[in-house]
Amino acid sequence: MGMLDGKVILVTGGGRGIGRDTAIVAAKQGAKVVVNDLGAAIDGAGADKSPAQEVVDIIKSAGGQAIANFDSVTDLRAVGRMVQTALDTFGGLHAVSNPAGILRDRMAHNMTEEEWDAIMTVHLRGHFNVVRATIGHFRSQQDGVYVMWSSTSGLIGNVGQSNYGAAKMGIAGFSRIVALEGARNNVRSNALAPGAATRMTDSVPRDEETAKRREAMREIQSPLRPAELAVALMSDAAKHVSGQIFGVGGYNLSIYSQPRPIATYQREGGWDAAGIVKDFLPRAEKDFTALGRPAAATVVKV
């Protein structure tokens, strides 16, 4: 038996990268899959039906069930059509994985409004549209799963990706709130921060040494790794898992901390600006988060 036997899932951005592998792995685990992909370029331009259809053909050739959809997650009514396709074709919908995305990388001082808005629309608005179009169905059937896609660009930060990072940090917060709101109706949501070699990561500028290291890591950083985690989280075996942020990169799986106060300093009557500069900031400095990549977490071999 497959881990997703009897499940119907929707995968946006399912024609390439992480979405492609998620759709294929889910089908191997018994799910019926709606493979959505507009087929746009990395910057969101254009459209191409072949990526989504190719994944459907792969699934069907292996004996699975799938149907393609070519709409955009930026349009709520279009996402509604994706949901209706699942209901009409397969008789239900149980989980959604939403890695559909684009990039418009630029330093903040050079970024245009259009570059900012394009990222917010596809990533953050796209995640909202998916939830808004499916949450009523999930609540009614008292069951549903969201796998949302955050990024270390938001959770940790990455130069040149202020738009993308802000959207991805927003997705982490959105996932947490959907998990809180959905708990009473058995609706789960988790966010994933993947490290995988895809056409999106290939577009990120890097020096020659980093590029060589990246190429050597391509197999280890396969998009199959986060796809396997997404499928596991959509299964009934993970019914108790919600509101979490997971990282996956290469052979490693991580669980992220979520923002909570580290220390609180109280002053009778409250703090004025002079007191903050004199007494609060010097005391708080030991707990500041440094810029740059954080120290590696402890690795536990299993």
List PLM regions with ranges.
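Substrate-binding pocket helix/loop in short-chain dehydrogenase/reductase
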Residues: 59, 107-108, 112-117
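C-terminal helical subdomain
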Residues: 212-302
